[in-house]
């Protein structure tokens, strides 16, 4: 049986299996014209979601669940999405790690192929943080379940891969992580 016959959600990723050819047939003229006529709307929506990640969370918030963000948390998310680096001093219990990880999730959805790393003193700490926040986010925002291709967690390593080839993994704040490259840490 060829790879083309497999049409299972986790096995049909063209990026991970070069022998796979999409089972999707090309669009007819009518469907293509409809897609083309709405392309500007899709582009505007993605641009809006990239610029206002807090409002995107409000949009995908389920009827029961989700969180209500404060204005300073909204500002934190917007700055994290718009700039490569930022500096802030926040108190304990302000949900810094949660907001950082959920902003990574949103960026992974809207920037295909981006690579993030969550860092902590050790890889074990970073792995535990990412696992806890991953579970918390999926509980509060089940929409992200459809965007995640695979999530692997072990004692000293963690990786979340998205369907658009973006990923989040962990690094330690130590000399053992020197030379490892990511788009954003």
Predicted regions and their residues:
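Phosphate/NTP-binding elements of NTP-utilizing enzymes
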Residues: 1-185
């Amino acid at each position: 049986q060829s790879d083309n016959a497999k049409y299972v959600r986790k096995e049909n990723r063209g990026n991970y299996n070069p022998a796979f050819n999409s089972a999707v047939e090309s669009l007819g003229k009518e469907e293509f014209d409809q897609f083309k006529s709405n392309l500007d709307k899709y582009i505007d929506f993605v641009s809006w979601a990239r610029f206002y990640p807090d409002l995107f969370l409000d949009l995908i918030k389920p009827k029961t669940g989700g969180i209500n963000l404060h204005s300073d948390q909204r500002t934190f998310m917007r700055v994290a999405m718009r700039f490569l680096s930022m500096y802030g001093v926040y108190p304990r219990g302000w949900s810094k790690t949660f907001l950082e990880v959920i902003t990574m999730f949103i960026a992974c959805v809207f920037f295909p192929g981006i690579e993030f790393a969550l860092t902590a003193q050790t890889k074990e700490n970073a792995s535990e943080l990412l696992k806890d926040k991953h579970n918390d986010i999926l509980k509060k925002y089940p929409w992200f379940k459809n965007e995640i291709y695979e999530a692997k967690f072990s004692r000293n390593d963690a990786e979340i891969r998205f369907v658009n080839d973006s990923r989040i993994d962990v690094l330690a704040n130590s000399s053992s992580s020197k030379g490892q490259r990511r788009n954003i840490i």
